[in-house]
């Protein structure tokens, strides 16, 4: 019954239900054998619609959401997966990871494996539902068609509530171009596609977590990943951050290829009052081209258990032609999530505070979230599935 109900939610709001497209899949449903499946590229189609159809044994996709409180100490990080590569960690292809960080440095992490996922694309937006009828839970996201707003709804025995987003930026592709753009790329490294439907915006968090109510305001963002092969195959590491300070929204991401040794793609974007004012993929100084210099910082108070004891970031955005120079310092305030993958490396995220602006002008302060992932060189769990 639930499957029919979730399919009707968006369709009921349009005059023409046939205008909606339904992607309805069960936990083990995918093509058998080495069959080529559809994987859409580029930045003309909506970033939030399904990009793999159907699933096969090598590819996958993720809808990722995060948020951090105004004081930089509370956080959440969610991953809605359609990805058979994660079946090694649980039952089926539909992993759902929900992680919460609290001001007292406690963390709560919950994992769900859905029996079915339904993604409904209608003229007014996209709704995705991950659910289990046998276990009696369902978690969902609803994203407006122009990707300016989103709502996450949580409904299980231990999690109940909503998280709402209102973007203060514009959707961007992997090279920082604003959607839609026929010349933009979503492929920072070979076979891995990435975009930010919401680089950053305001967040209102209202969730009951294991019987305790938590409400706060802050910022957050939404990312999309879709890959032809596993993350371990496509990547050796990634770094990323988002921040919102005064009128500014900053997004920075760096990807290092796992297939093409030495290939690194990074992208930095800056918005002011909702308008993109800076974009660059150049990571070295130049007298003529816009460039970004980003580096980890150390010596701060908050770090994790991984080998890399990073405590923040410094990001320099420079436009020689416009004679503009923006600097942002990000200092970690709390550990949002962390998982060890062996060899002292793994994935981690931090809630933080950013300070910065244009050099010589008024400086602003606001919440930020950083994340990093490094795969071990040798692991029985992570093997290349490139074919």
Curated annotation (Swiss-Prot):
What gene name is listed for this protein? Answer: ORF3
Show the Pfam families listed in the entry. Answer: DA_C (PF22903), DA_N (PF24137)
Which molecular-function annotations from GO does this UniProt entry contain? isomerase activity
- UniProt key word Isomerase: yes
User: Pathway it belongs to?
Assistant: Secondary metabolite biosynthesis
Q: What is this protein called?
A: Diels-Alderase ORF3
In terms of superkingdom, the source organism counts as Eukaryota
Organism (species):
Pyricularia oryzae (strain 70-15 / ATCC MYA-4617 / FGSC 8958) (Rice blast fungus)
Keyword entries, A-Z:
Isomerase
Q: Which InterPro entries match?
A: DA_C (IPR054499)
Listed EC numbers: 5.5.1.-
Cite the source lineage: Eukaryota, Fungi, Dikarya, Ascomycota, Pezizomycotina
Query: What task does this protein carry out?
Result: Diels-Alderase; part of the gene cluster that mediates the biosynthesis of a tyrosine-derived cytochalasan acting as a fungal signal recognized by resistant rice plants and leads to avirulence in Pi33 resistant rice cultivars. The first step in the pathway is catalyzed by the hybrid PKS-NRPS ACE1, assisted by the enoyl reductase RAP1, that are responsible for fusion of the tyrosine precursor and the polyketide backbone.
Please give the family membership noted in the entry. Belongs to the Diels-Alderase family.
Expression induction or repression: Expressed exclusively during fungal penetration of host leaves, the time point at which plant defense reactions are triggered.
- So where does this one cross the membrane? none
